[in-house]
Amino acid sequence: MAAQKSSVAVIGGGIMGGDIAIIFAAGGWNVHAMSPSQKTRDALPARIAAGLKKLGAPEVNAANARTHATLPTLPWKDIGLVVEAATEELPLKQKLFSEIEALARPEIPLASNTSNFPIGEIGRALKHRSRVAGLHFFMPAHLVPLVEVVSAEFTDPRVAESLVTLMKTLGKAPIWVKKDIPGFVGNRLQHAMLREALYLIADGVVSPEGVDTAVRYGFGFRFIACGPILQKEMSGWDTNALVGTALYPHLYSTPDYPAAVKAMVDKGYLGMKTKRGFWEWTDESI
């Protein structure tokens, strides 16, 4: 059930689907992107060409991308991998996977780019669930190296391993998430930090500017060189154990989203999109 370099079906041509199409086109794959939206299909060729140029990939590869309005029109006998990147609606994804299973060759991997739903729920009703896995890219997908390959309880490990290998050949930095947990790994790490930051702001400990400064010019400054585990390997786990033992009881662990931020959202203060969030924004500052 390994994905063989040939043709990839990208289901959904929106922001994520378009970026995923760019990744595979840059890698020399034939790309078949399906979207029911005529507007999306019309825009996709130019978007892929622009993405290839930004990546420094051969622009002639854009000619290997095709768009389709419906699933049955894809050349399924040639498709070696399916990546679903449709709207984040669970019933829609389940319906798509059911239709794809009836069309795709039985030996090819079927992957979902979902960031919200368990892979197990997306593929639970399929007859051949062992070939279903998560392939979670981060926006902008063609520029951000990280990809999470997610195994559900029924995913064949060989499928996950083949996707990890494939992502490496496409120049990505994949990790294998071996349990189908909410948020996978990247989003859990981001939100763990964000929860602490928002509560520190809500409790008047520090300003929003102070939080961003602490991250950008403190520990975040080192992250491009090494992650948190390697950093502690370097500084010593004995030191970390002492600090963590003293500090962890004081960290925010509530499951509730901060009321102060909820109130801000209720007022319509959503950030740049509404010209006000923690800060006020103008067209010039944006």
List PLM regions with ranges:
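Rossmann-fold dinucleotide-binding core
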Residues: 109-183, 187-188
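Acidic/polar active-site rim loop that often engages polyanionic ligands
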Residues: 26-29, 140-150, 224-226, 245
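Rossmann-like NAD(P)-binding element
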Residues: 39-43, 53-109, 117
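NAD(P)-dependent Rossmann-like dehydrogenase/reductase catalytic/cofactor-binding core
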Residues: 2-4, 27, 169-175, 179, ...
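Hydrophobic/aromatic beta-strand patches that form the interior of the parallel beta-sheet core
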Residues: 32, 68, 83, 133-135, ...
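Structural/interface elements that position substrates and couple domains in central-metabolism enzymes
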Residues: 32, 169, 186, 190-196, ...
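NAD(P)+-binding Rossmann beta1-loop-alpha1 motif at the extreme N-terminus of oxidoreductases
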Residues: 1-54
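Rossmann-like dinucleotide-binding cores of NAD(P)H-dependent redox enzymes
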Residues: 33-60, 151-159, 174, 182-189
